A protein has these predicted regions:
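The feature captures the beta-strand-to-loop junction immediately N-terminal to the Walker
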Residues: 20-22
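Helix-to-loop junction immediately C-terminal to a conserved catalytic motif
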Residues: 35
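ABC ATPase NBD Q-loop/coupling interface
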Residues: 44-63, 164
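ABC ATPase nucleotide-binding domain helical subdomain, centered on the C-loop/LSGGQ "ABC signature"
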Residues: 46, 62, 80-123, 167-168, ...
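A short, proline-enriched helix->beta-strand linker immediately N-terminal to the Walker B motif
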Residues: 143-147, 176
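Catalytic Walker B motif of ABC-type/P-loop ATPase nucleotide-binding domains
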Residues: 149-152
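Conserved catalytic loops of ABC-family nucleotide-binding domains
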Residues: 172-181, 189
Length: 198
């Protein structure tokens, strides 16, 4: 069966776009298509009028995307290595780390820690709260300065107050990043410029 039939989503550069719907409606399918994990049976994905599936374009497209899932994968390692995930130790940019931690509103908390960026977070980030883990995920997604930020139900496991605080951090990026926010709660996307219901 078709999940989407004649779907036409327009996402303007710098806009905040919400995609909302019930479980099983196809929200994650949209994300999987944008991330290239699924290929549409028909149709195309264009970024600035360029088909991202054309040879040579796909890698460029992915480099422009920062992804924040519901469950952030955490290394049993330091805050530094969790934010600069996948970056070789000698290539980690200290200034960039602090920039993205500030964007994620986690910098002040880290400055209070005796070991700062070298603080171990434990297995699956057990030494951090759910909100702090999500903020590490935000900082990680921002580290490589993507143009597009996709939040795939990134706040759905958080309590209302923590979700509101995380969304405040995200909404501060409005206009500087293109935000695609997948949610099942309307309050999560209340500040979006455009909302698609699936």
């Amino acid at each position: 069966r078709l999940i989407f039939d004649h779907a036409d989503l327009k996402i303007p550069v710098g806009a905040s776009v919400g995609i909302v719907g019930t479980s099983g409606a196809g929200k994650s399918t949209v994300v999987d298509i944008l991330l290239g994990l699924l290929e549409p049976s028909t149709g195309h994905i264009y970024a600035d009028s360029v088909d991202v599936k054309e040879p040579g374009n796909y890698r460029k497209w992915l480099k422009n995307i920062g992804y924040i899932p519901q469950m952030i994968f955490m290394l049993d390692d330091t805050i530094r290595k969790n934010v600069a995930f996948g970056v070789p130790e000698d290539k980690i940019d200290e200034n960039r780390l602090w920039e993205v931690l500030k964007e994620a509103q986690l910098d002040e908390f880290i400055k209070t820690l005796p070991e700062g960026l070298e603080t171990g977070i434990g297995e699956r980030g057990i030494r951090l709260s759910g909100g702090q883990r999500q903020r590490i995920g935000i900082a990680r997604a921002l580290y490589n300065d993507p143009e597009v930020l996709i939040l795939d139900e990134a706040t759905s496991a958080l309590d209302n107050d923590t979700e509101a605080a995380i969304m405040e951090s995200i909404n501060r990026l409005h206009g500087r990043k293109t935000l695609i926010i997948i949610a099942h709660r309307l309050q999560t996307i209340e500040k979006c410029d455009i909302v698609y219901r699936v």
